[in-house]
Amino acid sequence: LAPFPSCAITQFSAKPDLAAQVDVPAGFELETEAVRGQSCRYRTTSPLTLWPVKLESARLTGLPFTAPVNTLANGAVAVLRLVFTTLNPDVKFSQLGMDRLRLFLRGGQAAALQLYELLAAHTLGVALADTPGDLAPVLLPASAVQEVGFAPEEALLPWPARSFEGFRLLSEYFAFPQKFMFLDLAGLGAKTLVQESNRLEVFLYLDRTSAELERGVDANMFALGCTPMVNLFAQRCEPVALDHTTTEYRVLPDARRASVTEVWSVSSLREVRQDGTSPVSYTHLRAHETVLDL
């Protein structure tokens, strides 16, 4: 069985004078600070769009609440109000062209999971407005709140196509549930593209609430600019001398860091002869490949 590598959520911070988005691709490599002379290499597993905005405040309010009238959210018993501002007050939302924003739900695990369920399963609709009394809000359906982390391209671990994708999701969830604590707010461009202000209010109308969350939800429960990362990377291992004295040979990733590196999987294997030629490429025992010598 392959060991499960170290995982974490990393947060990127935008410079205050930034006036445009910054795209961080999946697979972006990071290195930790050295501990006892050794650092760890990580790579991000999902693409990230970093926006020069911050969450000014967040509040969950039950009935009676003050919010724009939303005809798509009849029967709402609570509303989550999120207030965003640009890092630079001189930058307007209309200059950014922001259509989607990713939120990471953090804090105590029990509260974060409860809030995730509330937003993912009990949102009736969304309103984008200037203030709670805005008479002309932009209304979005509940589908504007989207779960993140379940797509194959967002996998923490490389996964063979022959294996059921659900097993990977279960492995990742039980080993690192924080990977799935992300939600996207989509369709924001309907408001932000014409928002000549550095302030934007987002209202999520809910058909259920929690007295405990109403007391505890604030801006600290959300984080922007976050993405999962995993301590897993490709590397050519040290050559193995075949002396035919044993049936097992140790695969050593890096002789200089033997105590802090570990093999997760072997993706390819080639024979190299003394003259430097490499006539044979070995396939995996379970590979569906046939080599014909014609």
PLM feature spans:
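Extended, solvent-exposed segments with strong compositional bias
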Residues: A144-L183
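Conserved small/polar residues in nucleotide/adenosyl-binding loops
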Residues: T283-T290
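Cytosolic catalytic cores of cyclic-nucleotide second-messenger enzymes
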Residues: L294
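Ser/Thr/Pro-rich, low-complexity mucin-like regions
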Residues: L183-A223
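Extended assembly-interface regions of large multimeric machines
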Residues: L1-G133, P137-A142, E147-G149
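Exposed low-complexity, polar/acidic, P/S/T/G-rich flexible segments that act as propeptides
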Residues: R208-S278
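Intrinsically disordered, low-complexity boundary segments flanking structured domains
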Residues: L1, T66-N70, L113-Q114, A186-T192, ...
